Amino acid sequence: MANVSMRDMLQAGVHFGHQARYWNPKMKPFIFGTRNRVHIINLEQTVPMFNTALKFLSGAAANKGKVLFVGTKRAASEAVKESAIASDQYYVNHRWLGGMLTNWKTVRQSIKRLKDLEIQSQDGTFEKLTKKETLMLNREMEKLEKSLGGIKNMGGLPDALFVIDADHEHIAIREANNLGIPVVAIVDTNSNPDGVDFIVPGNDDAIRAVSLYTNAVATAITEGRENTLVAQAEKDDFVEAE
């Protein structure tokens, strides 16, 4: 089982929160103290809380659940995309478009448009158009790919959200709450933990910390899926033996 240790978190700087003056009092239970006017997060709480979240995500994946990684700020964007792809899941790593979950019907139409454009760009349709028309369609396709590329093959709403920075992604969290989709989120000392089902108190700005979270989640998801495949294979063997 994918587990993250106290040492891993210390080395990645997970314990460094935001400046004390920007804190959210709701994060008080997870704060160890203050050093140089910066809040220090209590990793003795973060370690078990993160490992519980990993267990949940692994279980969701084992039940063939879809996990949507959300991290649209610069420090998270690349790590979110890489880890989602590595674990064969889905991601939003640019702007969160309002209604991405709660207005899925409209989003699905945009995804269909993106897929149609992708087919047209490859089957020779674009070659029959004028340069200006081709340029406009390519621009439209790039714009749609940037917004929806990470969810175009999701095929419906996700079963769980994994979020980097609860404050920055509050709209995504609110939409998930409205639909009853469980949320795992990295929550820094300046953020509001309300609406997060699995709170992981930790630094949400340091690239090393973000990579630690996303890699651990990708590993947990992959292990969950592999365990299901192994169990299914053993079940099939057992049936054959009978």
Swiss-Prot record:
<dbReference type="GO" id="GO:0022627">
    <property type="term" value="C:cytosolic small ribosomal subunit"/>
</dbReference>
<dbReference type="Pfam" id="PF00318">
    <property type="entry name" value="Ribosomal_S2"/>
</dbReference>
<comment type="similarity">
    <text>Belongs to the universal ribosomal protein uS2 family.</text>
</comment>
<keyword id="KW-0687">Ribonucleoprotein</keyword>
<dbReference type="InterPro" id="IPR005706">
    <property type="entry name" value="Ribosomal_uS2_bac/mit/plastid"/>
</dbReference>
<dbReference type="InterPro" id="IPR001865">
    <property type="entry name" value="Ribosomal_uS2"/>
</dbReference>
<protein>
    <recommendedName>
        <fullName>Small ribosomal subunit protein uS2</fullName>
    </recommendedName>
</protein>
<keyword id="KW-0689">Ribosomal protein</keyword>
<dbReference type="GO" id="GO:0006412">
    <property type="term" value="P:translation"/>
</dbReference>
<dbReference type="InterPro" id="IPR018130">
    <property type="entry name" value="Ribosomal_uS2_CS"/>
</dbReference>
<dbReference type="GO" id="GO:0003735">
    <property type="term" value="F:structural constituent of ribosome"/>
</dbReference>
<dbReference type="InterPro" id="IPR023591">
    <property type="entry name" value="Ribosomal_uS2_flav_dom_sf"/>
</dbReference>
